[in-house]
């Protein structure tokens, strides 16, 4: 993909991806990697196109701070910003702008509704080899904003860090950097496996990711997560799931549906139930699991070739370094997986 690094990595560039200070304190490794991914995405995709998409997503999410922020080096004229509500007909927007923004809107609102026509249009503009990076960029500007909104309300106030939002770049592709971020998220084990799995499956069902709905975390399976428990996720409020699990699912829903509507009725019990470290892990977990939206949008979320067992489940686990240990059908399959705390 063409590089826009000269425009996107200058020291004076405003870090529109800057996270709430508490996240940098509670999860320094993962947030440093997320900063790297965000820096790289602005150097990979045309920053002017990405800025218009970021602003449109900010409006969709009710993110007032995001709508007011600007990445100055994207150089999007304010006249064009003012025309964003009319992007489909305004002469200020190119065909690529229109198709890119329309794709982003569908990605945010209901990613499973992404049409082949939309993908074909973008493929025509960008080329097949650049489509995944574009979808990844939309995911990043969406979920960075969701993370900013939710963490700012959910986590305690902490002093700003002067170095936040800037990080030393590593020589890696956008996909490789995103993978490193996901591995770092997985390495945290403050949450118990049952909570983690219920949250993961809530994300999968909301985004309608076929492969993620089929998967089952091995440590959660060993901790008692079965078909009966997972059947309660869709109607968790009226179920007999434990209250901590319901609280975690309420946070998940706010995060992936209406981050601007996270209420005191959710925040208060969350802070009383979970430690700041656990809440930070929960927020980052949701961003990690939601990378599934990239696969759903591109139609690469199929289960072909996976070892599905008689319960329709594929077990999987992680190595201590956060990488996937493998996929298997047998619960007794020997594999090294990370250890987790239990509530």
Model-predicted segments: where are they?
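Hydrophobic alpha-helical segments
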Residues: 1-343
């Amino acid at each position: 993909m063409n590089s826009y690094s000269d425009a996107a990595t200058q020291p004076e560039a405003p870090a529109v991806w800057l996270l709430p200070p508490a996240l940098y304190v509670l999860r320094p490794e993962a947030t440093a990697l997320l900063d790297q991914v965000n820096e790289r995405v602005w150097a990979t995709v045309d920053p002017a196109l990405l800025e218009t998409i970021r602003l449109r997503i900010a409006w969709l999410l009710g993110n007032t701070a995001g709508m007011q922020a600007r990445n100055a080096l994207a150089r999007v004229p304010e006249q064009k910003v003012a025309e964003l509500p009319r992007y489909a007909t305004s002469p200020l927007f190119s065909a690529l702008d229109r198709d890119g923004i329309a794709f982003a809107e569908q990605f945010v609102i209901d990613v499973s509704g992404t049409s082949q026509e939309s993908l074909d249009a973008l493929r025509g503009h960008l080329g097949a080899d650049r489509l995944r990076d574009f979808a990844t960029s939309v995911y990043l500007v969406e979920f960075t904003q969701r993370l900013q909104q939710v963490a700012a309300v959910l986590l305690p106030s902490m002093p700003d860090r002067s170095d936040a939002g800037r990080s030393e770049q590593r020589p890696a592709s956008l996909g490789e950097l995103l993978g490193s971020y996901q591995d770092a998220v997985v390495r945290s084990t403050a949450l118990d496996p049952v909570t983690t799995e219920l949250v993961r499956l809530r994300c999968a069902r909301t985004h309608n990711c076929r492969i993620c709905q089929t998967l089952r975390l091995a440590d959660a399976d060993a901790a008692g997560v079965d078909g009966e428990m997972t059947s309660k996720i869709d109607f968790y409020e009226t179920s007999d799931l434990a209250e901590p699990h319901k609280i975690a699912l309420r946070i998940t829903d706010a995060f992936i549906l209406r981050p601007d509507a996270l209420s005191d009725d959710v925040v208060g019990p969350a802070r009383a139930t979970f430690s700041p470290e656990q809440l930070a892990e929960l927020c980052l977990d949701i961003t990690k699991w939601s990378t599934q939206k990239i696969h759903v949008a591109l139609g690469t979320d199929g289960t072909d070739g996976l070892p599905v067992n008689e319960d329709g489940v594929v077990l999987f686990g992680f190595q201590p370094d956060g990488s996937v240990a493998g996929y298997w059908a047998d619960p007794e399959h020997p594999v090294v997986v990370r250890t987790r705390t239990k509530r």
